[in-house]
């Protein structure tokens, strides 16, 4: 076995050789800092325009450690060391932190958090679109405790609205935009207990089609929850698990079609080819359901049947932006979370890189003069990377040392808990004996669990566009939709608004500027 001291010595030599020549010159760093300072000084000219459009990107489980690791991966995919790379979200001028706890949970789940950042109120874990007065799985605590979302506020203001996700369209994050449910797992009536059904509660897929009937764009997975039980799936005809689940016999795709005016162009699609051949100018309503359940991981995607997140976002914006009153679009990179839960860091990080690609595409189709874009996460994960790795070390590679306890190597990426806990012959598994670069490799964890857990630390909030400066410090998570509504002059945020000028800005004047900067807690 190689001596740990020899490994460290080799690592030191390699580290010195990996420093790019330009970075050895102090002028490189000074010039870079001066450019950053110049940009920061320009931010003193605040953008107080009305946000005609609002786009919210939600990286499910995209904690700060995931953002950093995704940044390195993005650079390495372009054959760079990686650490110096800038994600699209890194370019946003304003950054805040969001406190993610649920009303009854120190470490949150994705349902209670979605209610916070979409509806503006904190809620109990496992519940969507309801206040903390609703208890999980108790249908009879729902009525009277429903809360509406920024998607509803935007639709009521005449804007077009859309939902794009890589999970099921009735999963926790998107469901808080339109549903009111005591349990996030009530995907269809097949997943609901008899008591809840008898008390009149509706499943989330049903609510998607009935609560806000004119959502302009809906894209993601979740086909099977829309069809009667045992109905064969259009793509996976021989797969019993892909068949319809509904006990009430409803075909919710037909329901969706029936609610659309005949003079409007409505399209239901189920594969990538259909999506990319659409003419957005001839689409008023779009329902795209590309998988029976969640969509495929980016690394596993079928390029014929499965669109990427960025492809869905481009089409969604092309459809929504036709509305002269603007739009609200919720985009979820939902499978970042799933990759982490499975201990598959490579899957999770490639999902994060794809979401960042979608952020870039959205930026190229919109202007920060009239579009507020917010990028954040619902919660973090117990995901970390370290081990004194040298510059440019593969983010999925080994640390440059051996454990001083069991004398075995370890990967830079590790989890605090999860399915990667493995004991071989009474000892920690020797990772040099396995393919730790495999797409589905499960990184080692300290505590054995079938599913890795969320983390409880704050998450980042990146913002650009009108009123983005109002996301500026450490906030409660439910503050986020209030800022978006204020910027767009929708919902309860109309008092400060005035007819827009040709540039789309708020009426000028010190009084209105002062109001824009006044603590929002006073206004709500």
Swiss-Prot record:
Pfam families, alphabetized: Alk_phosphatase
UniProt-reported outcome of changing residue 298 to K: In HPPI; does not affect alkaline phosphatase activity
Catalytic activity field: a phosphate monoester + H2O = an alcohol + phosphate; diphosphate + H2O = 2 phosphate + H(+); pyridoxal 5'-phosphate + H2O = pyridoxal + phosphate; phosphoethanolamine + H2O = ethanolamine + phosphate
Effect of mutating residue 297 to D: In HOPS; 1.3% of wild-type activity
Consequence when changing residue 224 to E: In HPPI; partial loss of activity
Result of altering residue 327 to G: In HOPS; requires 2 nucleotide substitutions
Effect annotated for changing residue 162 to V: In HOPS; severe; 1% of activity
Description of how activity is regulated: Phosphatase activity is specifically inhibited by 5-((5-chloro-2-methoxyphenyl)sulfonamido)nicotinamide (SBI-425).
E.C. designation(s): 3.1.3.1, 3.9.1.1
Binding site for Zn(2+) 1: 60, 110, 378-379
Identification of the protein by name: Alkaline phosphatase, tissue-nonspecific isozyme
Species, as recorded: Homo sapiens
């Amino acid at each position: 076995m190689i001596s740990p001291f020899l490994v460290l010595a080799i690592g030191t030599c390699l580290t010195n050789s990996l420093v790019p020549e330009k970075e050895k010159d102090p002028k490189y760093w000074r010039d870079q800092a001066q450019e950053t300072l110049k940009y920061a000084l320009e931010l003193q000219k605040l953008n107080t325009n009305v946000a005609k459009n609002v786009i919210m990107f939600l990286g499910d489980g995209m904690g700060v450690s995931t953002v950093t690791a995704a940044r390195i991966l993005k650079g390495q995919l372009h054959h760079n060391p990686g650490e110096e790379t800038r994600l699209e979200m890194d370019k946003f001028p304003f950054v805040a932190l969001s406190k993610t706890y649920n009303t009854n949970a120190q470490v949150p789940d994705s349902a209670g958090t979605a209610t916070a950042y979409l509806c503006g109120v904190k809620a109990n874990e496992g519940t969507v679109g309801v206040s903390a007065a609703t208890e999980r799985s108790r249908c009879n605590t729902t009525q009277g405790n429903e809360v509406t979302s920024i998607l509803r506020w935007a639709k009521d203001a005449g804007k077009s609205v859309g939902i794009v996700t890589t999970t099921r369209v009735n999963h926790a994050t998107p469901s808080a935009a339109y549903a009111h449910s005591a349990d996030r797992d009530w995907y269809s009536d097949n997943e609901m207990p008899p008591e809840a059904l008898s008390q009149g509660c509706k499943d989330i897929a049903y609510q998607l089609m009935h609560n806000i009937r004119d959502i302009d764009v809906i894209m993601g997975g979740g086909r099977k929850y829309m069809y009667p039980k045992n109905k064969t799936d259009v793509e996976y005809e021989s797969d019993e698990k892909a068949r319809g689940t509904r006990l009430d016999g409803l075909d919710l795709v037909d329901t969706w079609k029936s609610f659309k005016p005949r003079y409007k162009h409505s399209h239901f699609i189920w594969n990538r080819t259909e999506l990319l051949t659409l003419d957005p100018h001839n689409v008023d309503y779009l329902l795209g359901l590309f998988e029976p359940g969640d969509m495929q991981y980016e690394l596993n995607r079928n390029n014929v049947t499965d669109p990427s997140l960025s492809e869905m976002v481009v089409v969604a914006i092309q459809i929504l932006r036709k509305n002269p009153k603007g739009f609200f679009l919720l985009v979820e990179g939902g499978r970042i979370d799933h990759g982490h839960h499975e201990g598959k860091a490579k899957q999770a990080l490639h999902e994060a890189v794809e979401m960042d690609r979608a952020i870039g595409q959205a930026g190229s189709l919109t202007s920060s003069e009239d579009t507020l874009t917010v990028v954040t996460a619902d919660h973090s994960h117990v995901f970390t990377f370290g081990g004194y790795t040298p510059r440019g070390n593969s983010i999925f590679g080994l640390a440059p040392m051996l454990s001083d306890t069991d004398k075995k190597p370890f990967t830079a990426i590790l989890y605090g808990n999860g399915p990667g806990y493995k004991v071989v012959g009474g000892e920690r598994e020797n990772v040099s004996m396995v393919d730790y670069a495999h797409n589905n490799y499960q990184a080692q964890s300290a505590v054995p669990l079938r599913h890795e857990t969320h983390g409880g630390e704050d998450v980042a909030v990146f913002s650009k566009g009108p009123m983005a400066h109002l996301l500026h410090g450490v906030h409660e998570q439910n503050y986020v939709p209030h800022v978006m509504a204020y910027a767009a002059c929708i919902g309860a945020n109309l008092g400060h608004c005035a007819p827009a000028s040709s540039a789309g800005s708020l009426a000028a004047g010190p009084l209105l500027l002062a109001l824009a900067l006044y603590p929002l807690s006073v206004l709500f």
